[in-house]
Amino acid sequence: MKKSFVFAFWMVLSGLVSAQTIEVSGEYQGRVLWDADTVRLVGDVFIEPDEGGEACLIVERGTWVIAEGYYRITIHNGSFYALGADKIPITFTASDTTDFYNPEVISGWRGIRLVSDQSNNQDTVFMEYCRVSYGKVITGAPEGERFGAGLEVRNKKYCYFAHCVFTQNRCGHNGNSPNSGGGGGMYVVNPGTLLVEHCVFHDNYAWWGASISAGGLRHFTVRNCEFYNNSGHYGTALDMHVGELSLSDSGPQVYNNYIHGNHGNAAYLGWEGVGLLHDNIIVNNEGYSPVLGTTAPNYSHYYNNTIANNRSEAFIGGGGSGIWTNGQQKIYNNIFYGNTGIYFERMDPSHADPTAYNNCHLFPNGVIGNYDIYADPLFVNPTGGLGPEYDHATDAAHWSLLEGSPCLNVGATNMGTFCPETDFLGQPRVVNGRIDLGAIEAPDWDGVEEQVAKSCAYPNPGKDVLHIETTLENAIVMVYDLNGKKMWEQQVNGSPTNIATEDWPSGMYFWQVVSAGTTTLAETGKWMKE
């Protein structure tokens, strides 16, 4: 436990509460601190400014906030700080999840609501190493109560989310328009700046924005995140309604994300103006509509994305992407592979005038670009089929390129300031003045002697230990997380590795086997930490 003895005290003026286990409900003013092993939410909590104009909730690392009913935490005209640590996260959840998946039954809890009256305030939101689960919006909820099952944020100056997990949050279906509700994991509207990085969203549901639904954005970045097994209709990973952006606005940036195995349109991009999507891996999703969709006069840049084995069965569009409304998108250096749609394997250009250069497709249809390649890109190990049913860790899929791939060193470099600096794994994007296609830059194969090896990682998935075995003599084994951080490096000679992983965060990792003393990449694969 966090403390070796039990004590409790209450300071009325500051709202300070500290104990092993505390119960909270009702109205508070000013600064409130929750520093306890467990905070039991036994009623709605409402925090508003004190006479000095301050309102703030601070949750200390290691705290479990458990709702004992369908209750909600609301901060009105104030800030929110929940800063956990790598091995000491903060958890927000519900004690009773009976009938949670019945959209008409009140169950779970009502999540966190952070609302300011005006967008020009100084209120901020910081969440780091937090886990938010079992937030719920029921079908038939009153208007104004239909957004943000896990988290709802309105009119905050700065919002920062890092190393957080949003899972098992559900928004009931209250209509088909964006105004009818959405945001299973989080709903954010009119932030001054929104940054989401190194977060995981899985098993959330909403008709609009199962993971993230956001609107009124000017400075918005989602990077190095993972989205999987979310369900809905529009934007199972991202649903963004931005409005008109001027050239002075930075525009949305979505890069280095892994979006896979979702049930529904992966990303719905409703912004007007310039946005940048690059170095994302978007694979094995399925939905009524295309994997990517834009419905506003849109001038976004799509660079070096790998969009593969997605399935769009019922909408007139592409399994790869659909551009539905007038726009002049820039589409460079992407790989479209194995996607299915009613008409297009790649992008439906019916209502747009995009500029496309140096993309790779299995066959010509949809958007036709300059210097396109129509060939198998030769991935190291693509998934074995279309849709979420083939999105399994045991498939050891890896979307880097083999030696001999037609996608090596043929990418366009005329993107100006929009040219990405790094690839999906954080490696330099431009090598010797040349760029590969797709999300992962391959090693420089020039002058490398071909080597053949057989390697495997087990158990997969695993928990506390990872073994990597290879037939390559004098080999070096390296393991990276999704952000390109090297977690392990070891030289092996015939014996399998014995890597202790109990302290590693759950998620996806990539392993590589190289020949010692060279840069020869012999084999690579994927490993899932439970």
Predicted stretch roles:
Residues 20-271, 284-288, 311-313, 319, ...:
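Beta-strand/loop edge motif enriched in small/polar residues
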Residues 63, 85-87, 96-99, 136, ...:
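Acidic glycine-/aspartate-rich tracts in secreted/extracellular proteins
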Residues 240-398:
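Predominantly extracellular beta-rich ligand-binding scaffolds that present long acidic/polar faces
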Residues 441-453:
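Low-complexity, Pro/Thr/Ser/Gly/Ala-rich linker/spacer regions in secreted
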Residues 450-458, 462-530:
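C-terminal outer-membrane/trafficking sorting elements
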